[in-house]
C-alpha cells in the first residue's frame, strides 16, 4: 500500500521494528545505504521478530541508485523532517506514496528534500521536544496515511 524509505539508518532495532510494522501494514521497506549495521544483523531480525521473512524489502547501495530507479515517482515522495512547520496531517497521502525517514542522528539530506520540498512534513512536538524515535515517527505518519486511505486497506 505504501513505501517506507529509510535513508542511512543507524539503529538496527529501529529498522527491525519498522520492518515488522511494514509487514503488518502491507507496506514495502526501502533501505538506502550506507547503514551503521548489516541488514542481516541479528538485532534487526530480533526486533522484526518472525516477520522478517515476510517483509517486502529493497536495499539500495546509495541514494543515487534509489533515485535512478524511482525518479518517476518524485511527486509522491514525502519527507519526515524537523526542518519544516507543515504538520503531517495536512498532507494528502495516496496508496503507493513513498514516506522517507532519515538517519536517527542526521535526518534526511536537504538536497533530497528539495526534490519536492512541498512534501516535507513534520510531527508537531511540545516546546521541550526535539524529535521522536525513528520507528515511532514512521508509525505515526504511516498510520495516518492508512487512515486517509482506509477503504483500500485490506485487514485480516
Where are each of the predicted segments found?
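Post-transcriptional modification and biogenesis factors for structured RNAs
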Residues: 1-156
Amino acid at each position: 500500500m505504501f513505501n517506507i524509505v529509510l535513508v542511512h539508518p543507524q539503529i538496527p532495532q529501529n529498522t527491525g521494528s519498522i520492518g515488522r510494522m511494514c509487514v503488518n501494514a502491507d507496506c514495502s521497506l526501502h533501505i538506502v545505504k550506507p547503514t551503521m549495521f548489516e541488514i542481516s544483523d541479528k538485532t534487526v531480525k530480533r526486533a522484526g521478530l518472525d516477520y522478517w521473512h515476510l517483509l517486502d524489502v529493497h536495499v539500495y547501495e546509495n541514494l543515487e541508485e534509489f533515485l535512478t530507479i524511482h525518479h518517476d515517482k518524485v511527486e509522491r515522495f514525502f519527507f519526515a523532517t524537523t526542518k519544516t512547520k507543515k504538520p503531517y496531517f495536512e498532507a494528502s497521502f495516496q496508496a503507493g506514496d513513498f514516506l522517507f525517514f532519515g538517519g536517527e542522528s542526521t535526518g534526511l539530506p536537504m538536497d533530497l528534500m528539495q526534490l519536492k520540498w512541498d512534501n516535507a512534513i513534520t510531527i508537531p512536538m511540545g516546546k521541550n521536544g526535539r524529535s521522536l524515535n525513528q520507528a515511532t515517527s514512521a508509525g505515526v505518519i504511516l498510520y495516518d496515511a492508512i487512515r486517509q486511505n482506509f477503504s483500500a486497506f485490506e485487514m485480516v
